[in-house]
Amino acid sequence: MNLKTVFRAAAVFMGMWILGMWFAPELIMDQYGWQYTPGLTMMMRFMGLSMAALATLHWLIPEWSGNNISKFGMVSGIFWALFGAFGVYDLALNNVPHNANTIIGAVINFVFAILFYLNSKKEAK
């Protein structure tokens, strides 16, 4: 696996969340035990748009970055680790239910962080 593949896989993973936020917000809210409200639904649409921007950047960074891809990979890895840390934090404080979706979601964020880090180190050599 190379860094370009990691960026693309991350974009696809975000794409699944984007679809959920735009077309099945109730399903997403149910996973986290949130009450369905019109305000939260509207916020999910905007979060989906923000995630679409990030997914687009993840998809295009390998094309734009040239020899600097490892620098982008390191920065991306830091943010993926932060997303994972927030997931663990919310689990620890019981802000979200302890179920497979929330636990696996945090783990996947850490997996992407590790993949970005390892592949960035490999590309930098």
What are these regions (language model features)?
Residues 3-6, 14-41:
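Membrane-helix boundary elements
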Residues 7, 11-14, 48-51, 73, ...:
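Residues within membrane-spanning alpha-helices of integral membrane proteins
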Residues 16-17, 40-62, 75-82:
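Core segments of alpha-helical transmembrane spans in multipass integral membrane proteins
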Residues 22, 59, 88, 113-117:
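Membrane-embedded alpha-helical segments of multi-pass transporters/permeases
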Residues 33-41, 71, 96-106:
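Non-cytosolic membrane-interface motifs at loop->transmembrane helix junctions
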Residues 57-70, 91:
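Juxtamembrane helix-break-helix junctions at the cytosolic face
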Residues 63, 85-102:
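Membrane-helix boundary connector in multi-pass membrane proteins
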Residues 109-125:
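Membrane-water interface at the C-terminal end of transmembrane alpha helices
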